[in-house]
Curated annotation (Swiss-Prot):
Gene3D superfamilies: Janus/Ocnus
Top-level taxon: Eukaryota
Gene Ontology, cellular component aspect: cytosol
Function: JanA and janB regulate somatic sex differentiation.
Source species: Drosophila pseudoobscura pseudoobscura
PANTHER family for the chain: BCDNA.GH02250-RELATED, JANUS-A/JANUS-B
Family the UniProt entry places it in: Belongs to the janus family.
Entry binding sites for substrate: R42, C110, K111, T112
Gene Ontology BP annotations: cell differentiation; sex differentiation
Keywords: Differentiation, Sexual differentiation
Protein's name in the database: Sex-regulated protein janus-B
Active site positions, chain numbering: H69
Disulfide-bonded cysteines: none
Listed GO MF terms: protein histidine phosphatase activity
Length: 140
């Protein structure tokens, strides 16, 4: 009986530990790769990862109609921290997203974070179900 009680205590101790380590991983996998709005917008290419696990990062695109790339970055940092995830900016740029014409133009750079790899951004957009049939062009 003492052995069973001992195993029960081990199980109770292990549950919070497992929950701690699996929750950020699950959140990282559920994280949408693309979150952009319609119209002329600024965007960032972000690497999201579990602290200390940069090898298993997920690259995401985030873009909104805002005056500054910083607004996008800090809003995403706060959201990812709530999930136990870390964020690193890979650069930014601008987009013209015309959803009615199914066209997206990617161009420009970000003064704060530098230019994003627009071809990587295009690849991520085309991999999403919403934008896979869009005509996406990259300006130099």
């Amino acid at each position: 009986m003492k052995i069973l009680n001992c195993f029960s205590l081990i199980g109770q101790c292990a549950k919070p530990i497992l929950r701690t380590y699996t929750s950020p991983a699950a959140d990282l996998l559920k994280l949408p790769r693309v979150d952009i709005k319609e119209g002329k917008l600024r965007y960032l290419l972000l690497s999201v990862y579990i602290h200390g696990e940069t090898k298993h990062a997920r690259t995401v695109v985030r873009g909104w109609n805002t005056d500054s790339h910083d607004d996008i970055y800090y809003k995403n940092v706060r959201a990812m921290e709530k999930l136990g995830l870390c964020t690193k900016c890979l650069g930014g740029g601008k987009m013209d997203n015309d959803e009615s014409a199914r066209k997206i133009k990617i161009h420009g750079s970000c003064k704060t974070f530098g230019a994003a790899n627009h071809h990587k951004t295009k690849e991520i957009l085309l991999s999403s179900s919403k934008y896979k049939n869009f005509n996406i062009t990259v300006k130099k």
